[in-house]
Amino acid sequence: MSTTNAINGNLYEQLHQGRTNMYKSKVDVVLGAQWGDEGKGKVVDMLASEVDIVCRCQGGNNAGHTVVANGTEFDFHLLPSGVVNEKCISVIGNGVVIHLPSLFDEVLKNEAKGLQHLEHRLIISDRAHLVFDFHQHVDGMQEAEKGGKSLGTTKKGIGPAYSSKATRNGIRVGELLGDFNAFSDKFKLIVATHLRLFPSINVDVEAELTRYRDYAEKVRPYVKDTICFLHTALRNGKTILVEGANAAMLDIDFGTYPYVTSSNCSIGGVLTGLGLPPQTIGEVIGVVKAYTTRVGDGPFPSEQLNEIGDLLQTRGFEVGVTTKRKRRCGWLDIPLLRYTSLVNGYTCICLTKLDILDTLPEIKVAVSYKKANGDKLDHFPGTIAELGNIEVEYAVLPGWQTSTEHIRNFKELPENAQNYVRFLEKELSVPVRWVGVGKGRESIINVH
């Protein structure tokens, strides 16, 4: 070995020696592994009973999570699903975009269902950006302009709000709570900017400022520096769980662009959306529905536009929590899951809605993609044009044709249902830790 290489080798060893770990705990993460609606909220609800803090890191009220607790069904859009656990602190991080009217409406609706004492256990980042009503109007107009090539946006203003953030004329929660005259000037400027681009939008600036003066006082008790809060919690050994919104295939960078959301809903968004370094991440739980669904437009290789798709839609009650649109349905897609596992680094899987497959005599699983010329693809296509022209190859597995809804022990599942789970494990080389066979948290089976 040359002297230079020897020195470099020593330097490399030195770099990795003597590391000090300033944290006493880790951050576990729950991420959607497909196109959303996998059942992340239920998984978070299950795990939140054992953690100190639950966080949202990205997205806005375009996300929809349903949690059933003590027989009551809660719908969350901005609030982390962990708020149903009264011993848990819920954090809305800096990467989230917040429409305050929707947040307050969501709080009121869920308080009416029995959610209590949120003022003592909800923290909102002062660095989170605000979504204004005009962002929502612009969202609808931009979607209408696309005509037959619409992206299927929720029209909640999420994209325009992130656009304002990226062009550096967005407004953050902390600015609303500071000098209100400075906030007013900035609000007038952002409205003027949007009016130049979209002259037909109607904004009553003075009425909005009056409204936001009230919102400032309503939201003030919840707001603090969440970055310091979370790092202090980790140094003190507090357990933290992050609830990813949307899902990997809707990620702005890694999803089926442009049929995606406007934020990073993969593991990277957890770090930037909460101000966490990579070494704080512990378990990364990929939530996988036992079949595949998608809301809105965009390519969907394993989609079933037939009686199978109809059966999955009907049995699975596949209607969007936020949009109320019927979800498109298809078979489980292994190449897609391998891809999102590469990006996110799943340490384990929670497989949900296995019971929806109970009536099928046989079940197909997409196992590989082929190009139009017959060549197998060894990677997930990077463009929608390429993804739209692939041919899907399926494995056919025997069904079990008996109800799994009331089973609570993995070994009591029908053999073919167990084989379906093991097939997924083998194909992904990631262990399946939980299997869901119903709506409530009690319907989640511990596999190992």
Swiss-Prot record:
Annotated InterPro entries: Adenylosuccin_syn_GTP-bd, Adenylosuccin_syn_Lys_AS, Adenylosuccinate_synth_dom1, Adenylosuccinate_synth_dom2, Adenylosuccinate_synth_dom3, Adenylosuccinate_synthetase, P-loop_NTPase
Name one process (GO BP) from the record.
Answer: IMP metabolic process
Q: What is its EC number?
A: 6.3.4.4
**Which reactions does this protein catalyse?**
IMP + L-aspartate + GTP = N(6)-(1,2-dicarboxyethyl)-AMP + GDP + phosphate + 2 H(+)
Q: What class of enzyme is it?
A: ligase
Single GO cellular component term: cytoplasm
Q: How is the cofactor bound?
A: Binds 1 Mg(2+) ion per subunit.
Task: Identify the cofactor(s).
Answer: Mg(2+)
Q: Where does Mg(2+) bind?
A: 37, 64
Q: Which cysteines are joined by disulfide bonds?
A: none
What single Pfam family name could you report for this chain, choosing any that match? Adenylsucc_synt
Q: In which residues is substrate bound?
A: 321-327
Instruction: Write down the Gene3D superfamilies for this protein, in alphabetical order.
Output: Adenylosuccinate Synthetase, subunit A, domain 1, Adenylosuccinate Synthetase, subunit A, domain 2, Adenylosuccinate Synthetase, subunit A, domain 3
Detail which positions bind IMP.
37-40, 62-65, 154, 168, 246, 261, 325
User: Which pathway, metabolic or otherwise, does it act in?
Assistant: Purine metabolism; AMP biosynthesis via de novo pathway; AMP from IMP: step 1/2
- Annotated catalytic residues: 37 (proton acceptor), 65 (proton donor)
Alphabetical list of SMART domains matching this protein:
Adenylsucc_synt
Key words, A-Z: Cytoplasm, GTP-binding, Ligase, Magnesium, Metal-binding, Nucleotide-binding, Purine biosynthesis
Q: Does the keyword Ligase apply?
A: yes
HAMAP family in the record, alphabetically? Answer: Adenylosucc_synth (MF_00011)
State the family it belongs to: Belongs to the adenylosuccinate synthetase family.
* Assembly and binders: Homodimer.
Q: Which function does this protein serve?
A: Plays an important role in the de novo pathway and in the salvage pathway of purine nucleotide biosynthesis. Catalyzes the first committed step in the biosynthesis of AMP from IMP.
- Write the protein's name: Adenylosuccinate synthetase
